[in-house]
């Protein structure tokens, strides 16, 4: 039986690969997509997500979400993804529109209609998820688990200690990590290992139409290079759903720093149990890189 999932995203070049995997992995049933401000503005992430759904002729409802963090000024990652978020490929014009509901209400309604609890996957800032949990607490029993790309048990990528998705809205992340729902965190500890090699990247134009499109986008992606390999951060959250055997997880207490002058957005991961607090997150720490690369090749070959 396919696993029903809702995907919250901020496309973003590596988001495009994660969305492809969510659509074409035969083990998954992507039922709803929502967008959030992150890599670029929410207007741009929504446009990019609709372009991708049209490209793959995927009839999946999409709702636009939060345009700003809960309490902070927005930040973005245009330096990594380009000003549009997905520069490099000329997508065909379309007439698709997002749902009228804001993202967190669309998630609420879809959860309440679902016949069984649903897995939420969040690969951008956690603003929409925090709004859902704070404004609609009745939804919690309907969430099977939350799988995120975000955080780090060590170094950051937008500050010395903080990963971008968490640092973009630390208050939202803190709300989510305190919520009591089951969380799997695929942070930089594994996503920095999730590299597609130059040899594989060179085969993409001949793979299929998705390969051609991704190859064009990758030429504008700044998380690595076509010559040294590219890190597929967001794809790790989808990979864990399908191939959890590729990941080594450890249950840990995780809190989010919201006050520090230099540490705001840091995920404080208590790997050794120093704080004596019960674990609230399953933290991914290691990745079978070759197995991951093989799985990526298999799923993208299906993305026609």
Swiss-Prot record:
SUPFAM superfamilies cross-referenced by the UniProt entry: Nucleoside hydrolase
BP GO terms, sorted: purine nucleobase metabolic process; purine nucleoside catabolic process; pyrimidine nucleobase metabolic process
Top-level taxon of origin: Bacteria
Listed InterPro entries: I/U_nuclsd_hydro_CS, Inosine/uridine_hydrolase_dom, IUNH, Nucleosid_hydro_RihC_nonspecif, Ribo_hydro-like
Gene Ontology CC entries for this record: cytosol
Active site location: 233
Pfam family, one: IU_nuc_hydro
Keywords, alphabetical: Glycosidase, Hydrolase
Molecular-function GO terms, alphabetical: purine nucleosidase activity; uridine nucleosidase activity
Enzyme Commission code(s) on record: 3.2.-.-
Class in the EC hierarchy, top level: hydrolase
Keyword Cytoplasm: no
Record-linked Gene3D superfamilies: Ribonucleoside hydrolase-like
Family: Belongs to the IUNH family. RihC subfamily.
PANTHER family according to UniProt: INOSINE-URIDINE PREFERRING NUCLEOSIDE HYDROLASE, NON-SPECIFIC RIBONUCLEOSIDE HYDROLASE RIHC
Function per UniProt: Hydrolyzes both purine and pyrimidine ribonucleosides with a broad-substrate specificity.
NCBIfam families: PRK10768.1
Name of the molecule in the record: Non-specific ribonucleoside hydrolase RihC
Biological source species: Escherichia fergusonii (strain ATCC 35469 / DSM 13698 / CCUG 18766 / IAM 14443 / JCM 21226 / LMG 7866 / NBRC 102419 / NCTC 12128 / CDC 0568-73)
Gene: rihC
């Amino acid at each position: 039986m396919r696993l029903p999932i809702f995907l919250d995203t901020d496309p973003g070049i590596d988001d495009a690969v994660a969305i492809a995997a969510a659509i074409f992995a035969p083990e998954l049933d992507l039922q709803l997509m929502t967008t959030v401000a992150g890599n670029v503005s929410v207007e741009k992430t929504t446009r990019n997500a609709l372009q991708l759904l049209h490209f793959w002729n995927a009839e999946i409802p999409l709702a636009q979400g939060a345009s700003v963090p809960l309490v902070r000024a927005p930040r973005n990652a245009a330096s990594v993804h380009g000003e549009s978020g997905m520069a490099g490929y000329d997508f065909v014009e379309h007439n698709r529109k997002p749902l009228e509901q804001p993202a967190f209400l669309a998630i609420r309604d879809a959860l309440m209609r679902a016949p069984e609890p649903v897995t939420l996957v969040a690969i951008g800032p956690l603003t929409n998820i925090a709004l859902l949990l704070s404004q609609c607490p009745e939804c919690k029993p309907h969430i099977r688990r939350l799988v995120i790309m975000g955080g780090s048990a060590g170094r950051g990528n937008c500050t010395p200690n903080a990963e971008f998705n968490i640092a973009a809205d630390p208050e939202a992340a803190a709300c989510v990590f305190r919520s009591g729902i089951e969380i799997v965190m695929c942070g930089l500890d594994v996503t920095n290992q999730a590299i597609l090699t130059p040899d594989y990247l060179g085969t993409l134009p001949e793979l299929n139409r998705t390969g051609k499109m991704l190859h064009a986008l990758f030429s504008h992606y700044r998380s690595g290079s076509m010559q040294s390999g590219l890190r597929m951060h967001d794809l790790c959250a989808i990979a864990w759903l399908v191939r959890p055997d590729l990941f080594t997880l450890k249950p840990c207490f995780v809190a989010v720093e919201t006050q520090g002058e230099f540490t705001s957005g840091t995920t404080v991961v208590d790997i050794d149990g120093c704080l004596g607090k019960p674990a609230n997150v399953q933290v991914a720490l290691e990745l079978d890189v070759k197995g991951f690369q093989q799985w990526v090749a298999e799923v993208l070959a299906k993305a026609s």
